[in-house]
Amino acid sequence: MSSAEQHTCSRPVVLITGPTASGKSALAHALAKAINAEIVSADSRQIYRGMDIGTAKPSMEMLAEVPYHFINEKEIAEEYNAGDFTSDAMARIRSIHEKGHDAIVAGGSTLYIEGLLHGFSQLPKKDADIRRRLQEELNTGGAEKLYARLTTLDPEHARTLDPSKTQRLVRSLEIITITGKTVTGLRAAEHSRLSSVTFIPFGLSLQRNRLYERINTRTDAMMASGLLKEAEQLYERYLSAENRATINALETVGYKELFQYFDGIHSLLRAVELIQQHTRNYAKRQLTFFKNRLNVQWLAAPENLKELHEQKEQLITLYSKT
């Protein structure tokens, strides 16, 4: 067996996750530089070009220092889901290992993490008729009605979804209608397919009030860095609200609130407050997911460069023992 083949078979993959604004990206980058690894981004929005500030993408300097995957690989209007990511990421990890490099997965998109750790079945393609009927139900009865139905049919999966993410809600019910099986059940059937890669998951944790402070501060920093201009450029490309509603990426927190500002629905101050509120809500759902679905080793989220260095060294020590 070649050294590359031995590496592919033997090297586990460090997975760093945690709620938004917990410092995952900085820790993963520091670790990757230290062990000469490549980073697989498990962020469902960083894959899209043109959404840089609002998704907290790695800087150009960081991208030059470490090889990153699933950053700026898709156009915003392209459809890309967790099932696609799971298959692509597993293939990409194997390719990284074949080169003799280590891979680090970093991100907090719960469906992406779920797919890697627990698997996804080969989900059916979209059915235009079923989707149209569900969309009509959504338009007439609202998201609450569809979410209530999903909660009845697949409560475990429903708990992982944000009811306001209507495209995911419609897709979940579409899958159940087509297959006659729950999304939870389909994922369970897929779990064994992932046995070729062993993940060592770590999660970053911090007190809830401190996390919320970080979220508020980061939102202000994004606005100061040009998020309003970035959102305006997207708004001008996808002018109508109806057009934006058909593109899942444009439902991203940080953009949709500013689109509403451009539509005259909110003041700018209120839009920023909503970004902070919705991001806090998202972090809360992430924490619920991590608690209920993941078996991870928790680390204190670093608050400064000294703590970041200490966490990096701790991960290197733990990884060297695998």
UniProtKB/Swiss-Prot annotation:
Please, which domain of life does this record's source organism belong to?
Bacteria
Membrane-traversing stretches: none
Cofactor annotation: Mg(2+)
Catalysed reaction(s)? adenosine(37) in tRNA + dimethylallyl diphosphate = N(6)-dimethylallyladenosine(37) in tRNA + diphosphate
**Positions of the record's site feature: Interaction with substrate tRNA:** S109, R131
Residues that bind substrate: T20, A21, S22, G23, K24, S25
Report the top EC class in one word.
Answer: transferase
**Which keywords, in A-to-Z order, does the entry hold?**
ATP-binding, Magnesium, Nucleotide-binding, Transferase, tRNA processing
Residues annotated to bind ATP:
G18, P19, T20, A21, S22, G23, K24, S25
GO MF: ATP binding; tRNA dimethylallyltransferase activity
Name the segments for region: Interaction with substrate tRNA.
Answer: 43-46, 167-171
Q: What is its EC number?
A: 2.5.1.75
The role this protein plays is: Catalyzes the transfer of a dimethylallyl group onto the adenine at position 37 in tRNAs that read codons beginning with uridine, leading to the formation of N6-(dimethylallyl)adenosine (i(6)A).
User: Which HAMAP family does this chain map to?
Assistant: IPP_trans
Family membership noted in the UniProt record: Belongs to the IPP transferase family.
SUBUNIT field? Monomer.
- Protein's name according to its UniProt entry: tRNA dimethylallyltransferase
What is the organism field in this record?
Answer: Chlorobium phaeobacteroides (strain BS1)
Q: What is the lineage of its organism?
A: Bacteria, Pseudomonadati, Chlorobiota, Chlorobiia, Chlorobiales
